[in-house]
Amino acid sequence: MQPRVTTTTLFKMKQEGKRITALTAYDHPFATLVDAAGIDIILVGDSLGMVVQGKQTTLPVTMDEILYHTAMVTRACNRAMVVGDMPFMSYQSSINQAVDNAGRFLKEADASAVKLEGGADVCPVIQAIAKAGIPVQAHIGLTPQSVHQMGGFRVQRDEERLVSDALKVQDAGAFSVVLEGIPSDIAGIITKKLDIPTIGIGAGPGCDGQILVLHDMLGLHDRHLPKFVRQFADLRTQAARGLEQYRDAVRNGSFPAEEHGYK
């Protein structure tokens, strides 16, 4: 069995120039596959609201819902670092609320770390959670929980603010930072300035690692994919074909056959 990926593992990978791989997962079967594939980080993202629950944004996801999914994922993983995504309004009201909710991911769901969105504005929260002994992954740029404030899912281009936010979340104690929806050149500048690893999603090839939503890259749905997504499989088409074959086999009497019964 390979050793578990830790924050130290990720720091070393950045120092050695080894690319970090990350994906989302939301349940035990898929987390088992992702972990077995050697993916370094599994994020149990609040994106589950959109890709699993069928909602329009990530905002309605609750702590209890994401803890339920995180626990399923951690039970499947032997190597990958499992990061729990702190949902909207689970850390914004007070620092005490944020620390308590972050702690629930480790105590109740056996996660290794938490992720939260925001730059300079959430640095006191990052600092408090990290001080409590909980590893924190930051997330700057396009932050889906602020979709209404941003006026939609828009690429973020303010280089000065983005670089400043990245440096500040690092100083606050984040062990890594997700860069989402940022021009490639700015993401590259940030990556070179930081000591902690950068994980890109729609931020170009210059980041220390990459993350995608599992359902997007495996082709598990038919919704519009962002420009930055590469589809590595078409499981929806394969699943539809299998379901249709099952339907036809039951209707024409070829399933179940004699070998599927007991004597």
From Swiss-Prot:
Swiss-Prot/TrEMBL catalytic activity: 3-methyl-2-oxobutanoate + (6R)-5,10-methylene-5,6,7,8-tetrahydrofolate + H2O = 2-dehydropantoate + (6S)-5,6,7,8-tetrahydrofolate
GO biological process, any: pantothenate biosynthetic process
InterPro entries linked: Pantoate_hydroxy_MeTrfase (IPR003700), Pyrv/PenolPyrv_kinase-like_dom (IPR015813), Pyrv_kinase-like_dom_sf (IPR040442)
Binding site for 3-methyl-2-oxobutanoate: 46-47, 85, 115
Keywords, alphabetical: Cytoplasm, Magnesium, Metal-binding, Pantothenate biosynthesis, Transferase
Transmembrane regions: none
EC number: 2.1.2.11
Origin: domain of life: Bacteria
A cellular-component GO term for this protein: cytoplasm
SUPFAM superfamilies: Phosphoenolpyruvate/pyruvate domain
Enzyme superclass (EC): transferase
Main location as per UniProt: cytoplasm
Gene3D superfamilies: Phosphoenolpyruvate-binding domains
Cofactor (UniProt): Mg(2+)
Residues the record marks as active site: 180 (proton acceptor)
Record text on cofactor binding: Binds 1 Mg(2+) ion per subunit.
Family of the protein in this entry: Belongs to the PanB family.
PANTHER family: 3-METHYL-2-OXOBUTANOATE HYDROXYMETHYLTRANSFERASE
Protein name, UniProt field: 3-methyl-2-oxobutanoate hydroxymethyltransferase
Species of provenance: Desulforapulum autotrophicum (strain ATCC 43914 / DSM 3382 / VKM B-1955 / HRM2)
Lineage, highest ranks first: Bacteria, Pseudomonadati, Thermodesulfobacteriota, Desulfobacteria, Desulfobacterales
